[in-house]
Amino acid sequence: MKCLPENLDRNHDFQKSPRFSETGIALILVLWVVTILAVAVLSFSLTTRSEARAMLAYKEGMENKFLAEAGLRRAILELFYRKTNPQQQVLREGFEIFQCDGRPYTGELGDGRYRIRIEDESGKINLNGLTDANGVVLKNLLMNRGVADDEANVIVDSILDWRDRDNIHRLSGAEDDYYQSLPRPYRAKNADFETLDELFRVRGLTAEILLGTGGQKGILPCLTIYSKSDKINLNTAPPEVLKAIPGISGEIVERILQYRDLKPDEKVQLISGWLGPDLNVIAAYVTDAESNVYSIDAIGYKGNEKRRYAIRAVVMVEGAQKYRFLSHKSPSLSES
């Protein structure tokens, strides 16, 4: 059996040797550096991927926006074509006159698409032309949407009070005394509506009534502040508005809508053969004259329509090649 040298300490701790300590520290440092580099590379990779996705989304959004703008300009050109061809004669196939009753039209631009709807504002209920006499149309519209009779009276009277110049409220209306009693008080405008958003401040009107809920449409698309008439255009009014006009039955509404589809280049005339025995009643609320103010909803999309871009504009056509925007929302919440 060999003996250990006397100069060798049996209790010597190899882990405390300088050489071993330096090697261990170096190994730990290397591991830390590798870990930090791995985290940095992963973070850079994730950041780069996120930025790439953001750039692609931005690119797609801009392309969709330009497609929607193209649709808007196409709609304006169609309005010019309509104005320069008042008899609405179809010159040849593919050059049909665009109708202004909200029906959709589509177009392609490269690998993208746009869809547009044009509505003549004279086919809607004009809030700035509302009176105690014709307010019944708005009341009927509300009741057809499920609003109770007394609640509909409150809304119609409150809209009239919001516009009139005095501070005396109607039987079911509201003036300053009501609005000043609210938790956040304000005053009745006592002037014409400048935007439809003002309706949210009028007594009785809620988001559910204006915008709809649970599959039930709201009344906002049936209202306007831009029409020059206090009457409703039979040729462009949506079905919901037609059904709200006193004297017009469901049968007459269907007849009008069918005529529009079968003969889009002709107008529904204010004659008894069309409107039945209640012509005199109906005539107090309707017209067959087209206005020069139109709302346009345009959407653009490539591939996935869910990522579409929407624009809503109200345009006044002032001549053969002249127009101006009365309203322009980009993007909008359009459902075109």
Residue ranges, per PLM feature:
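Exposed boundary/loop context
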Residues: 2-3, 17
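Compositionally biased linear targeting/interaction segments
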Residues: 3, 25-336
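Glycine-centered recognition micro-motifs in short, flexible terminal segments and loops
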Residues: 9, 14-32
